[in-house]
Amino acid sequence: MRERILMNRDWRFLADPGADPVPKTQSAMYLSSKTERLKWGPGGWRHNDTPGFWNLYGELHNEPWEKIDLPHDYLIDQTPDVRENSALGFFRYYPAWYRKHFTLNENDRSRRLVLFFEGVTGIAEVYLNGCFLIRNNGGYNSFEVDITDIARFDDENVLAVYVNPNSYETWWYAGGGIYRNVWLEKSDPVAIERWGAFIPVRQTGVAE
């Protein structure tokens, strides 16, 4: 049986992050080069998304993370500016990060775990516990990623999504962000695929 858990509550959001700052310590560079789980930046598992706190490497940062719920469009609150592109609603389009912390129980170890995104504007890069999983191009399609081999059951999981709406898919206001639901789906290792099973018809005619 497939269990679906809505993941829309309690996300962290960072708008227009710019380039990741270069770490000041040798230890940060060393650890980041050794394992995906200690990668530097907002996609990393141990990145501190609480403003004003010391990070894993003993450096103070003050990123303006916000607490938000999904669905979320982070561009719509702007005041339209005539200096921006009229075809895109006179809004400035810029990238952003989303992060969500969640836990799994021991009973989930034997199950297949999939994250299903109903819609993310533009280009989306998905990380779990610092590991890059998938890049999706297109804000008008759903997509999924299997996290069974990356998920942690003895510690907190951190899902990070980098959104870049500058893909110019439209000539109208397209918005920016995770603008539809996100689901965590748990199933048996062997289960019917999402869109069901079917038997192709190889010939037509009267059934016998």
Where do the model's predicted regions map?
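Contiguous beta-strand segments within globular domains
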Residues: 203-208
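Accessory beta-strand-rich segments of carbohydrate-active enzymes
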Residues: 3-5, 12-19, 45-47, 73-77, ...
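Short glycine/threonine/proline-enriched tight-turn/helix- or strand-capping micro-motif at secondary-structure
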Residues: 81-85
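Serine/threonine-rich low-complexity intrinsically disordered regions
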Residues: 25, 32-33, 50, 64, ...
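Predominantly extracellular/luminal regions of secreted and cell-surface proteins
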Residues: 52-75
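Hydrophobic alpha-helical membrane-insertion signals
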Residues: 1-60
